[in-house]
């Protein structure tokens, strides 16, 4: 850890002198590091995965040596405690207990969450705070005007991290389909991710946000024009149990380029790429294929009254398909809480040559009663022939302009092939339905 901290100090020194000049020591500095895809597969689905979100989080937390930083919308890891064990509530209990155990062995644990509400109370984080764990809440509406802190972020020892769709919720481990990226032993990239966490952590004490200048302490180390170059081992497909996953992955060290993007614009510190800019770059740079999995998609706002039109992403997808003959495939979630404004836009997209849209429908659990706000594909990712985008945001204006979120953007052929295999697995699964069905 002394080496990791020294490395981060060196990187920050070079960046603060000139954020466009990155020390040569940052290149290949993740020797021995790994990158993996972690998934939650709802119980009862006939889909296999190499690494579950539960196992990834347990590995990160139980192996922490010095620090654990957690940034989440809310915490309901114990929410399944009173349910029949068949629902999988124990998975959330495991994570909660691992956090408590880490604190008890002297690990510095920090939690930042959205301001609690009646819908998302802070019962569990109050319990953790009483044990001595540091907990802060961001009054997001006061700082931004609307929206929430919607991020899902774990940082361990300033050298390992998780970014993805899974909430700190037992159902995100057992009853909801999720996907995220796990980085281990990669202080280069995690140093940059830690900057985003520090923004959240300190913003909890702000009465207003900095206007156009977060200061040099928050300058991004990398962005979409100056990416981190990393030597990482990707063993996602070792011992692959899914017969539908046709990529066998070598598990050898390869060079990766990668950067972190953030939303909303109010949290874009100097040199930081905006999440919407990263997403748009991926679409606009695709020459052959764009495959998208996201829970909600609409070229509008989703939470305003009235909602307003925002065709930025929609126009880019249509242009890619029509002007460049890019093959676009979209898997959008349909569940009990799908907004009634969403289907019309998907039906329209599906009429465009080279665009195919399908619903992904997670069937009800085999045991009653059914648990509200579960049984849905909550993953948020895009893969093109060139890159992978894995984020925390749904695709409507609100998530990019007023809501707190992150994305990891990865450039590596093997990793892209693996994410593409996951998309293909889901696209060809029995859980998709024609867009015309709803």
UniProtKB/Swiss-Prot annotation:
Which residues does the entry assign to the active site, renumbered to this chain?
Answer: 150, 152, 157
Q: SUPFAM superfamilies of this UniProt entry?
A: Phospholipase D/nuclease
Q: Which family does it belong to?
A: Belongs to the phospholipase D family.
Domain of life the protein comes from? Eukaryota
Taxonomic lineage of the native organism:
Eukaryota, Amoebozoa, Evosea, Eumycetozoa, Dictyostelia
Q: Give the positions annotated as glycosylation sites.
A: 50, 223, 336, 394
Q: Which GO terms describe its molecular function?
A: phospholipase D activity
Q: What is this protein called?
A: Phospholipase D Y
Q: Activity regulation here?
A: Inhibited by butan-1-ol.
Any idea of its EC number?
3.1.4.4
Query: What task does this protein carry out?
Result: Hydrolyzes membrane phospholipids, such as PtdCho (phosphatidylcholine), producing the free headgroup and PtdOH (phosphatidic acid; signaling molecule on its own).
Q: Which PROSITE patterns match?
A: PLD (PS50035)
PLD phosphodiesterase domain mapped to chain residues: 145-172, 373-399
Kindly give the InterPro entries that the UniProt entry links to this protein: Diverse_PLD-related, PLDc_3, PLipase_D/transphosphatidylase
Q: Where is the signal peptide?
A: 1-19
Under SMART domains, the record lists: PLDc (SM00155)
Arranged from A to Z, the UniProt key words for this protein are: Glycoprotein, Hydrolase, Lipid degradation, Lipid metabolism, Repeat, Signal
Q: Which organism is it from?
A: Dictyostelium discoideum
Catalytic activity, as annotated: a 1,2-diacyl-sn-glycero-3-phosphocholine + H2O = a 1,2-diacyl-sn-glycero-3-phosphate + choline + H(+)
Q: Which GO terms describe its biological process?
A: lipid catabolic process; macropinocytosis
């Amino acid at each position: 850890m002394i080496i990791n901290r020294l490395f981060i100090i060196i990187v920050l020194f070079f960046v603060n002198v000139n954020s466009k000049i990155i020390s040569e020591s940052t290149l290949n500095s993740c020797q021995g590091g790994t990158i993996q895809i972690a998934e939650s597969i709802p119980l009862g689905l006939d889909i296999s995965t190499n690494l579950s979100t539960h196992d990834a989080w347990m590995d990160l937390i139980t192996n922490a040596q010095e620090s654990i930083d957690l940034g989440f919308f809310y915490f309901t890891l114990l929410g399944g405690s009173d349910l029949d064990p068949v629902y999988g509530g124990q998975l959330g209990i495991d994570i909660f207990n691992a956090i408590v155990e880490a604190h008890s062995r002297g690990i510095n644990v920090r939690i930042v969450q959205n301001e609690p509400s009646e819908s998302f109370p802070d019962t569990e984080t109050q319990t953790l705070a009483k044990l001595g764990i540091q907990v802060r809440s961001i009054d997001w509406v006061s700082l931004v005007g609307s929206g929430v802190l919607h991020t899902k972020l774990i940082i361990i020892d300033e050298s390992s991290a998780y970014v993805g769709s899974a909430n700190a919720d037992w159902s995100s481990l057992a009853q909801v389909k999720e996907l995220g990226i796990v980085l281990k032993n990669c202080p280069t990239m995690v140093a940059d991710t830690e900057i985003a966490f520090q923004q959240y952590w300190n913003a909890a004490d702000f009465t207003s946000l900095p206007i156009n200048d977060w200061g040099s302490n928050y300058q991004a180390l990398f962005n979409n024009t100056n990416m981190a170059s990393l030597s990482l081992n990707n063993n996602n497909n070792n011992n692959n149990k899914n017969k539908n996953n046709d990529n066998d992955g070598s598990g050898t060290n390869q060079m990766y380029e990668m950067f972190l993007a953030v939303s909303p614009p109010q949290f874009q510190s100097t040199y930081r790429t905006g999440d919407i800019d990263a997403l748009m770059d991926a679409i606009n740079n695709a020459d052959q294929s764009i495959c998208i999995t996201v829970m909600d998609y609409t070229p509008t706002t989703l939470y305003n009254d009235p909602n307003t039109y925002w065709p930025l992403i929609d126009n880019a997808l249509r242009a890619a398909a029509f002007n460049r003959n890019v093959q676009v495939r979209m898997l959008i979630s349909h569940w009990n809480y799908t907004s009634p404004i969403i289907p019309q836009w998907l039906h329209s997209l599906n009429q465009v040559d080279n665009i195919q849209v399908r619903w992904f429908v997670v069937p009800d659990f085999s045991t009653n009663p059914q648990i509200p706000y579960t049984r849905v594909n909550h993953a948020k990712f895009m893969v093109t022939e060139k890159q992978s985008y894995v984020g925390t945001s749904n695709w409507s204006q609100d998530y990019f302009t007023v809501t707190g979120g992150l994305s990891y953007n990865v450039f590596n052929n093997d990793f892209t092939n693996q994410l593409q295999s996951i998309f293909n697995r889901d696209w060809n699964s029995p859980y998709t339905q024609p867009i015309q069905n709803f």
